[in-house]
Amino acid sequence: SQPAIRACAEIMVKASTLEKDGFANLRFAALANVPAYAPFFPAAYSAESQPTFALALEAADLAIQAFSSAATLAAARTALISEIEANARKLEAVAEQLQNIYHYDFKGLDFTLAPFPKEELSIGTALQKLGLSAVGYQGTLAASAFITDTLDQAKFKRCGFNGLMLPVLEDYTLGQAAAQGTLAVSDLLLFSAVCGTGLDVIPLPGDTSAEEIYPVLLDLSALALRLNKPLTARLLPMPGKKAGDE
């Protein structure tokens, strides 16, 4: 609802002042169409009283490994599916053991390709391995769709997003693209139509108002509802920072 969206925008602005670096907003996300049991920290919730668990993977490195040695898109797809399914089998076996020991309900795996802040563990790097000259240029949407379509074809017990995470503050290559002006919030919103989690850890100027954040969240919600997919937003106004500051 619009009141809920506006409330989220106001919370993001207020939370930005709770810590000097503005990182309190790492622990708050606006959710749109997100189901229960998604193992994504700020969006996770349960719909029942019984203890449950799910596993989320920072699996950008699997994509980089799969794409680095692939000569064609078909080979890249096959390699990534193979990597995901091989790792899923190992994780599911361990999770099922834990389920039997502790009687917690195992909901599944979220293989959303999430990065770690190193170039060799960057989802932006994985996208460029598919032939992009730079993330944010034309072709990024198609490359993003290729990855999420590949994830859809892998076979494992699913929960959560199982898509593509593009967190600017947590990804070396995406951060470089944003700093160089080739990757903007409008681009990330466009990619959300084919990706996974939406707008994640996007730094904003410290003086960004709730009135400026509100329409961004409104657009994200419209995408989530129109496309019937889960999306989230973690937007971080950075105290004392302006556009272009480091």
Identify the meaning behind each predicted range.
Residues 1-246:
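Anaerobic metallocofactor- and corrinoid-dependent redox/one-carbon enzyme cores
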